[in-house]
């Protein structure tokens, strides 16, 4: 049995584990190997989204994913432990709870904040590099406003309402932007004037986020200032106290009062990696040197990825950056190379990272980015930069936890966002009480039941009727179009070979053509059965004429009397099921979804009258949550969800919604 141990469940560790398990399974050696991933937490944290939790834009549960859920149904052992020591010569790892031997080691222990020896920085400042950090900082910010609202001492009150973020890189700017967006919400809640709150972003360099082009850095600075943030550049922090901060500005050292200081000035390798770096070849801040295949230059069975690796790609002057994209790329390369080393099949992959750009968000409504291909990059305006950020996150979630995390992410970021703190504002997050939809849901269901009953009365269970049904409708539309263009009615009717005598009779009374646009793949037709002066909603009809649908109807649905009868029975039974489901609030989502599909079928075959098109919009309106109030879904939904989540293949493919 070949043992592979992955240390660290960050971006690189989780992706490497998933990709390696998949590759070994495909190569048919999964039963001959054991992958173990070790982390001190039972969850994977989205470090790039911690500022959203710290400033209360999203709930704390949105930035973490349970490791057991991530690796459900896969041959991966999840171990909760803190690794203290790696014994490279013995191929062994020592943790607080046990020892673990390995044949191959993947070191992805991540990073931790670095304080550069600044006096008091570690003791008196808050950090933002873990789930716990974000929750603690969120509570601290809230407590400051709560205490300030009741504080009679002006000096103490000002101290509570003064926030410093040290570092104007990605984390610092995003934290300050999020906080600046959150402050007005807290001011309104605690009846505090916005001008009483002081926000300061400090950095020793001359511009924020210096890896951005200078033009975009300027935009970031202007955005922060517009949000009421004081941006203090070329200022080096020399000391941090319990309620003060000292900075060197030029040759002068100044002291400022500060109630909350957030340290985001830089990172270094985690303690485990730093200790390992003392035994094997490494570079600055505990990063371990690797070869082109991401193996330690001292031990070929030790792979180092993500923030822990030090590698300079051929033709480049600087080592790969400590960014998420590097973690993703290195995870893929390491997984491939370990699989090749184990199976002796395939080719080792040299690490050739291609970075597609950088972006920074200043709050939930504004972002800037520069992205594209390696040699062709462009600046993205705010909306598209924010869209790109969410799209990239979704791609990552698809890899890690599939549908369930994508759904959860969209819910947190778009559909339940409060105070319009989203790049689409609050347009998709306004909550309507579900009980208001009950009358609409019941009436929609009743109409479907009525339609089904009428079809039974008309004989849909007794004889083929679809040929007449479709033929009459087509003949009616064609006669109106023919009349508009001055074509003889007979010619129009001849064009519809399947039109029955009854259809031809209908076609004889032409109405008014209002719209006929042909887009090639489909044609939109809007007509009235009467002249406009005499028309009511019941006379106007709209149809999507889709050649593929027409072909399917002619060659499949109308192919035989037996097929017609089958389709008629299916349609009637579906209408009954939809109607009863909606009326009772049982399986409301699938009922409403099928309702939409049926309406589209009717729209593309016979067309819909305007007085019935309300059913389309009503079906959409009751899609989500309409059966959970005064409906059977209130009882059935939780029961089914509980048991559904325990099905093995459902857990493996993440086909559930938390």
Labelled PLM ranges:
Residues 78-85, 181-290:
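A Rossmann-like FAD-binding core segment of flavoenzymes
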Residues 1-77, 163, 173-211:
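Beta1-alpha1 glycine-rich phosphate/pyrophosphate-binding loop at the start
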Residues 326, 330-424:
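C-terminal, flexible cofactor-proximal segment of oxidoreductases
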Residues 411-574, 588-593, 598, 603-615, ...:
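Alpha-helical membrane-anchoring segments
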Residues 1-3, 76-162, 251, 262:
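FAD-binding core/adjacent interface of flavoenzyme oxidoreductases
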Residues 5-7, 100-112, 130, 166, ...:
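Short hydrophobic core segments
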Residues 123-157, 244, 254-326:
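FAD-site-proximal beta/loop scaffold in flavoenzymes
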Residues 157-212, 216-223, 230-232, 320-361:
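Rossmann-like dinucleotide-binding core of oxidoreductases
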């Amino acid at each position: 049995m070949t043992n592979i141990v992955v240390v660290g469940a960050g971006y690189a560790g989780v992706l490497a584990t998933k990709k390696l398990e998949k590759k070994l399974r495909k190569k048919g050696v999964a039963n001959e190997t054991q992958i173990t991933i070790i982390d001190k937490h039972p969850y994977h944290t989205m470090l790039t989204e911690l500022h959203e939790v710290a400033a209360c834009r999203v709930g704390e549960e949105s930035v973490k994913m349970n490791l057991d859920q991530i690796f459900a149904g896969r041959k991966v052992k999840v171990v909760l432990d803190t690794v203290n020591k790696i014994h490279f010569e013995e191929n062994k790892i020592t943790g607080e709870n046990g020892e673990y031997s390995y044949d191959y080691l993947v070191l992805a222990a991540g990073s931790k904040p670095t304080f550069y020896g600044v006096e008091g920085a570690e003791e008196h400042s808050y950090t933002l590099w873990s789930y716990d950090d974000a929750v603690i900082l969120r509570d601290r910010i809230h407590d400051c406003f709560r205490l300030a609202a009741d504080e009679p001492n002006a000096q103490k009150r000002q101290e509570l309402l003064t926030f410093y973020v040290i570092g104007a890189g990605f984390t610092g700017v995003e934290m300050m932007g999020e906080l600046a967006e959150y402050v007005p919400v807290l001011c309104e809640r605690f009846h505090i004037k916005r001008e009483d709150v002081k926000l300061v972003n400090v950095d020793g360099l001359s511009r924020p986020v210096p890896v951005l082009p200078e033009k975009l850095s300027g935009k970031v600075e202007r955005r922060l200032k517009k949000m009421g943030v004081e941006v203090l550049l070329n200022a080096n922090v020399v000391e941090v106290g319990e309620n003060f901060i000292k900075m060197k500005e030029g040759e002068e050292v100044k002291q400022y009062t500060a109630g909350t200081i957030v340290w985001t000035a830089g990172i270094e390798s985690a303690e485990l990696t730093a200790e390992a770096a003392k035994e094997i070849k490494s570079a600055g801040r505990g990063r371990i040197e690797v070869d082109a295949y991401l193996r330690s230059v001292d031990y070929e069975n030790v792979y180092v990825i993500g923030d822990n690796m030090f590698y300079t790609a051929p033709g480049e002057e600087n080592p790969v950056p400590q960014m998420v994209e590097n973690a993703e790329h290195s995870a893929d390369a390491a997984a491939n190379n370990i699989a090749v080393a184990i199976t002796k099949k395939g080719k080792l992959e040299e690490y050739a990272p291609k970075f597609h750009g950088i972006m920074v968000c200043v709050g939930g409504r504004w972002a800037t980015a520069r992205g594209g291909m390696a040699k062709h990059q462009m600046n993205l305006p705010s909306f598209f930069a924010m869209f790109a950020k969410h799209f990239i996150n979704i791609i990552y979630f698809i890899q890690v936890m599939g549908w369930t995390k994508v759904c959860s992410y969209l819910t947190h970021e778009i559909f339940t966002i409060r105070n319009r703190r989203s790049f689409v504002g609050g347009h998709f997050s306004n909550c309507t009480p579900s009980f208001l939809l009950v009358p609409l849901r019941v009436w929609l269901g009743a109409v479907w039941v009525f339609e089904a009953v009428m079809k039974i009365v008309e004989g849909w269970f007794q004889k083929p009727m679809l040929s007449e049904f479709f033929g009459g409708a087509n003949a009616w539309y064609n006669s109106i179009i023919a009349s508009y263009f001055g074509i003889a009615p007979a010619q129009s009717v001849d064009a519809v070979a399947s039109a029955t005598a009854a259809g031809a009779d209908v076609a004889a009374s032409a109405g008014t053509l209002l719209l006929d646009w042909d887009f090639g793949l489909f044609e939109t037709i809007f007509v009235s059965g009467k002249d406009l002066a005499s028309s009511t909603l019941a006379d106007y009809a709209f149809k999507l004429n889709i050649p593929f649908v027409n072909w399917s109807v002619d060659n499949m649905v109308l192919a035989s009397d037996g097929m017609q009868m089958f389709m008629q029975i299916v349609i009637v039974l579906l209408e009954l099921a939809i109607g009863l489901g909606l009326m009772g609030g049982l399986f409301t989502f699938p009922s409403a979804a099928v309702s939409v599909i049926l309406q589209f079928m009717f729209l593309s075959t016979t067309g819909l009258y305007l007085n019935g098109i309300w059913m389309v919009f009503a079906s959409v309106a009751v899609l989500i949550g309409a059966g959970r109030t005064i409906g059977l879904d209130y009882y059935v939904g939780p029961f089914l969800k509980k048991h559904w989540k325990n099905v093995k293949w459902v857990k493996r493919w993440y086909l559930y919604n938390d």
